[in-house]
């Protein structure tokens, strides 16, 4: 079946199977920034934005994005690069596998809250798992980024 949607503001049409997940479709079509870490919608590595809301693409049937706007890290590259600098400064990016998910979550957080509280930040990032480092470094980096990126 054909699937038509907007990928980073560009209309695309892909051939998909009805039971295919969005992460699979994106990766098959060259969007390798969408990582598949757990394949169970539990780690956040496959996070994308669908109509500006974060979703775990390894658990979302691709057909559900028909006509919608899907944003990957390529669609927020400048913001993601700035956040990556903060992660590096805090030692929060040892392997960077989780970084894409964090970048998209932080983008969504900025859209939702003008001045997020510590609890709101923690609530947003809770689904992003990192096996390399403690979450305090990510939290510190995100907090500094949000404060200075206004």
Per-region residue spans from a language model:
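Signature of N-terminal electron-transfer/Fe-S-associated modules in redox systems
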Residues: 1-150
